[in-house]
A protein has these predicted regions:
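Structured beta-strand-rich core segments of catalytic domains in phosphoester-bond hydrolases
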Residues: 1, 50-188, 317
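Acidic, histidine-bearing metal-coordination/catalytic regions of metal-dependent phosphoesterases
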Residues: 1-19, 65, 69-74, 155, ...
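Active-site beta-strand/loop signature of hydrolases that rely on acidic residues for catalysis
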Residues: 3-9, 33-64, 93, 168-169, ...
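Acidic/histidine-rich helix-loop elements
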Residues: 9-33, 115-118, 158-159, 191-199
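Short coil/turn segments at secondary-structure boundaries
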Residues: 17-21, 66, 104-107, 194-197, ...
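Glycine-rich, phosphate-binding/catalytic loops in enzymes
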Residues: 21-23, 67-71, 201, 237-241
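Intrinsic disorder
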Residues: 24-31, 54-58, 84, 156, ...
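Metal-dependent phosphoester-hydrolase catalytic domains
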Residues: 154, 194-205, 209-221, 226-350
Length: 350
């Protein structure tokens, strides 16, 4: 059996009292929160869990590295954020007394495929074309360069421009000799328009394809903060391997594109570990209230597994009816809660 955990720890620089105005400031202190995060990780480290973390800030990355090293873990990290979130990224911790780290990969997810490119409109004016180029096209390009003008991006350009990193490890259990692949990812957060939702579908597709391709036929776990609610297009795509092409969030190939068509559907479906055991997704995994916005409480985090993995147990999670106020709180140092599953990888997976 193997234990897998995913936890968005909330960046050290994103829990300001001026932001989480409905939380006790004492529960927002970065050092206090990190100590509480580590307390939650202690029990899972004691079980030899493979742990995926999201929103690992630069300030916390070194301290988490030391934390995991003291417990015999390798900690793979990729930071890609911006100054305001302290360059937050993702981390994957592997207990080296339990597993042989057969292989590891760190990638900017949008670099893992070739995106379709839109061809520029060609103006053909016969013998006047050189004059058009000299007196119209070139001045426009010069003006754009001087003013730093950038035309609005479509969903393909937006999806390609995201820097979110994904991590993968191929692991072999030292005791049973079975192998499996595990990836962790933190999706972009875009939902306001149909184009935004298509960006999310593109990244959900990329994450599933990446995890399955890196595992090269081995049983596969893909876990993290997907910023998708149950039933969203990206969630449907991952869990069924399919999505109706008439869905508003189905990525449509741009007109006049060059290159190969983008493959939307992953080679196989994956299923939520919590659905396997409980018959449904967690009641919520994120509970936050930003300033005077309406409280947000819903499910955004998942542990997805391929059909050849058996899920024997999942960590019990609270119900929203039993929650008193937004997180972070004294008992929850992040605005997300930790998910965990015990899995069984079939013999012969090597």
């Amino acid at each position: 059996e193997a234990r897998v955990v995913t936890y968005n720890v909330l960046s050290s620089h994103l829990a300001e009292p001026t932001y989480f105005t409905h939380c006790d400031p004492e529960n927002l202190d970065a050092d206090t929160r990190l100590a509480r995060v580590m307390e939650k990780l202690d029990a899972e480290c004691a079980r030899g869990a493979v742990i995926g973390l999201q929103e690992v800030s630069m300030s916390w990355s070194g301290r988490l590295h030391a934390y995991f090293a003291k417990r015999g873990y390798a900690f793979i990290v990729s930071l890609y954020g911006k100054p305001f979130n302290n360059y937050m990224g993702v981390g994957l911790a592997v207990p080296l007394d339990v597993y042989e780290l057969v292989g590891s990969d760190v990638a900017r997810l949008s670099d893992t495929v070739k995106f379709p490119r839109v061809k520029e409109n060609e103006v053909k004016l016969g013998p006047l074309t050189p004059l058009y180029t000299l007196f119209v096209s070139k001045p426009i390009r010069l003006w754009r360069k001087i003013t730093d003008y950038r035309p609005p991006m479509d969903e393909w350009q937006t999806a390609r421009g995201r820097f979110n990193s994904i991590l993968h490890a191929t692991l072999r259990c030292k005791k049973s000799k079975v192998s499996f692949g595990v990836s962790t990812y933190h999706m972009p957060c875009m939902f306001r328009t149909a184009a935004d939702r298509r960006v999310m579908t593109i990244h959900a597709s990329l994450a599933a394809q990446y995890a399955l391709n890196q595992s090269a036929g081995l049983p596969t776990v893909l876990m993290g903060d997907f910023n998708l609610k149950p039933g969203d297009a990206g969630h449907t795509l991952i869990t069924t391997g399919d999505l109706d092409e008439s869905h508003e969030a189905y990525p449509i190939m741009p007109d006049r594109y060059s290159g190969e068509p983008f493959v939307v559907k992953p080679p196989q479906k994956m299923q939520s570990a919590y659905v396997r055991v409980n018959g449904e997704e967690p009641n919520f995994t994120n509970n936050a209230q930003i300033k005077d916005d309406e409280p947000f409480i819903d499910t955004l985090d998942y542990i997805f597994v391929t059909d050849d993995i058996q899920v024997t147990e999942v960590l019990d999670l609270p119900h929203r009816d039993n929650i008193n106020g937004p997180f972070p709180a004294a008992t929850e140092p992040s605005d997300h809660i930790m998910l965990a599953a015990t899995i069984r990888v079939p013999a012969g997976s090597a």
